Amino acid sequence: MVWKGVPMKKLLFIVNPRAGKTKSRAPLFDAVAQFSRAGYLVRVYITEAGGQARDITARWGGQYDMVVCAGGDGTLNETLSGLMQLEQRPLLGYLPCGSTN
């Protein structure tokens, strides 16, 4: 539920579409819907190359209340590396979607 007059929290959602064995992304759409219902304004970035999760997090992460990444251990590592470059670090969430998850 979102209350009128209460500013929405901002969430940066980084998705690695190449992670894991499955091609179904329905759970990720469900996650975005859940965050939205919880009062977050969600910005989704789909990575296209290695290192991009780190770069996106380092450049934009400081403007968000929470950064959530969906991917494998490499995506999580990149996102953490990007967060370490920030003076003010937002909360971190992880949706494991790697080949061993």
Model-identified regions with their sequence ranges:
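Short, Lys/Arg-enriched N-terminal segments with co-localized hydrophobic residues
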Residues: 1-7
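Small-residue-rich beta-alpha loop regions that form the catalytic core of phosphotransfer
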Residues: 9-101
